Structures are given as structure tokens and as C-alpha cells.
């Protein structure tokens, strides 16, 4: 089995605040074929901001 063809690949979520802070998570390609956008806490700026999937 190839890792690249995995249904749940590991993706990085990078902060849109420009701090460079990232979360690492897994996503289901069948349910979320587009890039993920999640609102999470960025400890560098101490507030909730959008995190976008980074490839």
C-alpha cells in the first residue's frame, strides 16, 4: 500500500496571522477534497485565527 494514496493523509494547518505557527492533523480526502480552513487558537498572537491547509 502506498502512503501517498492514503485516504487520510497528514496535513499541516498554517496560521493566517503570519506567525508561522502550525498544527498537524489528518483529513479525510473523500469528505474534504478541498483545502481545509479551520479556526483555531494561535498562541503567538494569543487569539483565535484561521488556519489553512498548507501543502
Swiss-Prot record:
Q: Which UniProt keywords apply?
A: Ribonucleoprotein, Ribosomal protein
A GO term for molecular function: structural constituent of ribosome
What's in the GO CC field?
cytosolic large ribosomal subunit
**Known PROSITE patterns for this protein?**
RIBOSOMAL_L33
The record ties this protein, via SUPFAM superfamilies, to: Zn-binding ribosomal proteins
UniProt xrefs under Pfam families: Ribosomal_L33
> What are the coiled-coil residue ranges?
none
InterPro entries reported for this sequence = Ribosomal_bL33, Ribosomal_bL33_CS, Ribosomal_bL33_sf, Ribosomal_zn-bd
GO BP of this protein: translation
The similarity comment for this entry is: Belongs to the bacterial ribosomal protein bL33 family.
Query: What HAMAP family does the record tag this protein with?
Result: Ribosomal_bL33
Q: Which NCBIfam families match?
A: PRK00595.1 (NF001860), rpmG_bact (TIGR01023)
Name listed for the protein in its UniProt record: Large ribosomal subunit protein bL33A
Q: Source taxonomy lineage? A: Bacteria, Bacillati, Actinomycetota, Actinomycetes, Kineosporiales
The encoding gene is: rpmG1
